[in-house]
Amino acid sequence: MNIPNSVVLWKDIHEISDKLCKYYGLSYSKIVPETRKQSRHFGECRPCQKCCSAAHVDERNCNEKILSIRIHHLNNPRKPLATSTILRTLAHELAHLRCWDHGKDHRAFEEELVNHMRELGYRIV
């Protein structure tokens, strides 16, 4: 049976994110493929629609955030990005679950996540 590369990538992404979230006590609603509308970024972490539309909810405190991860080149959707790039993007977006901005704490936690991925046996440049 020939399994498409993107299916394997999504399986791996979910497996890795589940391990990291369990270890660090993080939570999100779902991970979805990034769309062409988000072509300037490799990923995105955004609050769920319910929190976005509620005037009284601080979006940073949403427990049901949605992660978008790009796994293919925009100009060649059949060609996946390098695994290292995808895993770095995943670490960056998961870091937003704890540190919403791009400050020093976010960068430090992102590196901690990358190092944990390496300890789990994933190769990240």
Residue ranges of model-derived segments:
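Active-site-proximal or metal-binding-adjacent scaffold patches in catalytic folds
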Residues: 1-88, 97-125
